[in-house]
Amino acid sequence: MAVTFSDLSSPAGLDSLDAYLLSRSYITGYQASKDDLTVFSAVPKASLASYVNVSRWYKHIDALLRISGVSGEGSGVTVEGNAPASDVATPPAADSKASAADDDDDDDVDLFGEETEEEKKAAEERAAAAAAKPAKKKESGKSSVLLDVKPWDDETDMKKLEEAVRSVQQEGLTLGASKLVPVGYGIKKLTIMMTIVDDLVSVDNLIEDYLTVEPINEYVQSCDIVAFNKI
């Protein structure tokens, strides 16, 4: 279903987008798509400080563009006064490529000249200072996961199935929104969002050691990973 936003360069438009993203990670669906790119290109970065949800989403999409690009199709989105995003987003080209033409005019500049004694001494001092500082604890990354949980048959109590799934507690695991999706022949599956701390939770182990063992396997037949995105 297509989504429409008013002028995102105005406070009213940003207020509307901020409220929309309160319970969503992406503009449409459960993974980054062209819809996110359309809105991303219309949002003025300098105005995000007052909009917590827009700022969170903007930084996430910006990181995806730098790392791997965005190619999801999306459901369609319209931003008043803004042109649609290109078909497939790719990571930004390196600065060296963007300035290749200018380099032709700088043949007389020695870009790779030898370091002076002063530069070497300064580099050594910086290295010594860095070595003297205590190592900072590396922050663990997080991922957003969309999981399909399938029952045994149409007689499975889906309410109890969801209660069983939500009873799973593990450090670094946060369960989010869920919904029942018809599969066919009267059978429904549970689709549930979750956020995991990468260093603490393995989705494969979560499925094998928690969701498909007793007593939960009384309701759960199998689980499939539908989407997995770094946050």
Swiss-Prot record:
It comes from the Eukaryota. SMART domains: EF1_GNE. The keyword Oxidoreductase does not apply. Keywords: Elongation factor, Protein biosynthesis. Signal peptide: none annotated. InterPro entries: eEF-1beta-like_sf (IPR036219), EF1B_bsu/dsu (IPR049720), EF1B_bsu/dsu_GNE (IPR014038), Glutathione-S-Trfase_C_sf (IPR036282), Transl_elong_EF1B/ribsomal_bS6 (IPR014717), Transl_elong_EF1B_B/D_CS (IPR001326). Residues 101-117 have a biased composition (Acidic residues). Residues 118-127 have a biased composition (Basic and acidic residues). PROSITE patterns: EF1BD_1, EF1BD_2. Residues 75-136 are annotated as: Disordered. GO terms for cellular component: cytosol; eukaryotic translation elongation factor 1 complex. SUPFAM superfamilies: eEF-1beta-like, GST C-terminal domain-like. GO terms for molecular function: guanyl-nucleotide exchange factor activity; translation elongation factor activity. The keyword Hydrolase does not apply. EF-1 is composed of 4 subunits: alpha, beta (1B-alpha=beta'), delta (1B-beta), and gamma (1B-gamma). Belongs to the EF-1-beta/EF-1-delta family. EF-1-beta and EF-1-beta' stimulate the exchange of GDP bound to EF-1-alpha to GTP. This is Elongation factor 1-delta. It comes from Beta vulgaris (Sugar beet).
